[in-house]
Amino acid sequence: MAKDLRIVTVSLWEIIKIHSLTFVFGVWIMCKMSAKWVWDPKSFFTLQQRDTPPACLVDSSLGQHKYVKLKGVKFHYVECGSRDLPLVLLLHGFPDCWLSWRHQIPVLSQHFRVVALDLKGFGDSDKPSSRKTYRIDMILEELQQLIISLGVSSCTVVGHDIGGLLGWCLAHQFPELVDKLVAVSCPHPNVYRTSLHTSSNYRWLNFVQLPYFPEVDALREDVKIISKYHKHLPPHDTYLEAYKYAFCRKEDWTGPLNYFRNLLFIEVAENSRTIQVPVVLITGDRDKFIKLESIVKSTDYCEKFQVKIVDGARHFPHQERHQQFNEILLKSLVKKKSVEDGGLERSASKGIVNRMFGAVSSTVKYGNSVLDTVHKKTNGVVGSIPTINLLSYANIYDRTDS
């Protein structure tokens, strides 16, 4: 439990429910694993030998590879850009490493000092095996020390997936450290936890609470889970091979899985203040892991926010549609927009609302939830989804309250 009770442990009932589902889904998935092993044992245990890191993992063309030791833990990061510029801290997701931001580092470094971190347990950072070393309070304190060690008092945090969850928590726990938060393919932690039952990998999230077996399962069929998550990369792609190299040992999975073994048991205290700094939520319109409904609900925890949708992207919009993503990112972080009508940026929101309501109309089961959010944010003015003039409600998805 983090100090000041901003990040708290979930209720006893939630803990019991998670452990119960862990047993149920754990037994089910292990039975499936056993059946696959019996049917084709050679394919099940196939694991290509990978002793040499691909050049892209050690290449310095994207920036300098650096290390810092915090509380006895070594962190690896890649830094690019002038030290006189504002700092942008990039936090990757799962299963990934600093290389996740290969398309963003060159672009951002023209305007910022960029640090792409290997989270603890990932990449070339240390990989302690103990689950307790991945408690949220320890992770956040290490991120706090990292930012301070870089010689700044605050920075912009851009996080994807797990990195986004950590960014949300950092903005709540240490608001003085975060100038702006960009959460990519990642709803607010409270929304993430409450919407897990609708997630396509719900069973897997419960299964990974077990010890040892999830690590073994991740290695089967030559680290097939990497290909599953990184479907946007073709077979034998250089970057796909780099990810498989980074996750080719059992100990390479213990740390990453320990994040899930801890994050499912925490939430932001309901009496905490909403996040005061600007928040940009970016998601792909084809993401199967994160629902659009969850992104919209996450704005309840923000005073100032923008919601941006990357067309044609799934869970990795910063890689799959990196040009469109970079344009959104730079526009949010660098370019000054004209503000009209009491601080509401209408023009930037028009495309979002069109796609938002388009998504709602084609996905009926989420319509009521999005409508409830619209109703709430307009203080009851909007009671139903209109069939015409949808753009007149653009401001509710791009709020810059003073």
Task: Identify what each model region corresponds to.
Residues D84-L85, P95-H103, V114:
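Serine-hydrolase catalytic-loop signature spanning alpha/beta hydrolases and amidase-signature enzymes
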Residues S100, L119-F122:
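Recognition helices and adjacent regulatory flanks at domain boundaries
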Residues G93, E320-R321:
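Active-site helix-initiating loop/hinge in glycosyltransferases
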Residues L99-R102, W168-H172, N326:
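Short, hydrophobic alpha-helix immediately C-terminal to the catalytic nucleophile
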Residues A2-K66, G72-V88, V115, F122-V158, ...:
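Flexible "cap/lid" subdomain of the alpha/beta-hydrolase fold that forms the substrate-access gate
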